[in-house]
């Protein structure tokens, strides 16, 4: 079982798979780049190309059983990888769509800003940051005594990067705050979208998975908070970045 990012070095992957041919007589491939490897090895060995969404569904079912010791209930599965897709678990699995926001957007943005490509380093910096040094909250707009806005709504984000004004001295803006804000912006938008979709399908359980959430406590806190506000249950499974690979292995 091997799980890889979309932007992985394909030549290195092919070398790795070539070295493993003596140990295995069958390869199962899934994901957007799976076709490249399936085509490469199809004439040499038993190679199968699997539907990405079906593989993820099977992987999540397996991880849920291992983590919770029971079958997966009716749920909305939100897989945040390079991009994001939604799967509805309700009498089977159904792909509902997704978003371009995710790890690909995040890594591309921090590469443009800071010329870094280390995800874990970015997370460490973000943990030291404070998004509200640059993000505009509703409470920054409405006066404290304004009865039109309740206490919960005051804590919502009115505008990501909303405190970065035209005359701001950019040298005063901290890298840690920007990366923190960026992660929160992704989480808030995906969390809001997921909760609206879940409500439309009368779903209470939201299962969040994918490589972007690996050791990403900031996103986990944001997604949990949004679910709590919307009276939904946020579920995070260990090793969920491997759900596609697990599903492919078991197919």
Name what the model sees in each region.
Residues 2-6, 17-52, 85-95:
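Short beta-strand-loop/turn "lid" adjacent to the catalytic site in phosphate-handling enzymes
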Residues 27-37, 196-197, 201-225, 241:
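Glycine-rich phosphate-binding loops at beta-strand->alpha-helix junctions
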Residues 48-77, 83-91, 246-251:
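Conserved phosphate-binding catalytic cores of ATP/NTP-utilizing and phosphoryl-transfer enzymes
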Residues 91-146:
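Glycine-rich phosphate-binding loop plus the immediately following alpha-helix
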């Amino acid at each position: 079982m091997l799980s890889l990012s979309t932007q992985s070095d394909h030549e290195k992957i092919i070398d790795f798979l070539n070295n493993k041919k003596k140990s295995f007589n069958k390869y199962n491939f899934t994901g957007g780049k799976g076709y490249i490897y399936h085509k490469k090895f199809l004439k040499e060995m038993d190679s199968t190309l699997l539907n990405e969404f079906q593989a993820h569904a099977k992987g999540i079912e397996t991880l849920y059983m291992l983590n919770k010791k029971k079958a997966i209930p009716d749920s909305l599965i939100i897989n945040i990888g390079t991009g994001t897709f939604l799967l509805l678990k309700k009498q089977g699995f159904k792909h509902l769509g997704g978003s371009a926001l995710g790890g690909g957007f995040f890594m591309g943005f921090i590469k443009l800003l800071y010329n870094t490509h280390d995800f874990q380093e970015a997370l460490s910096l973000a943990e030291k940051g404070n998004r509200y040094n640059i993000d505009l909250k509703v409470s920054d707009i409405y006066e404290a005594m304004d009865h039109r806005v309740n206490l919960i709504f005051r804590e919502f984000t009115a505008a990501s990067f909303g405190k970065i004004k035209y005359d701001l001295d950019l040298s005063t803006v901290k890298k840690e705050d920007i990366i923190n804000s960026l992660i929160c912006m992704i989480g808030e938008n995906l969390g809001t979208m997921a909760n609206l979709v879940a409500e439309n399908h009368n779903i209470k359980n939201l299962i969040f998975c994918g490589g972007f959430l690996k050791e990403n406590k900031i996103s986990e806190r944001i997604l949990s908070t949004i679910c709590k506000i919307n009276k939904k249950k946020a579920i995070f499974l260990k090793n969920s970045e491997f759900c596609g690979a697990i599903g492919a292995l078991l197919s």
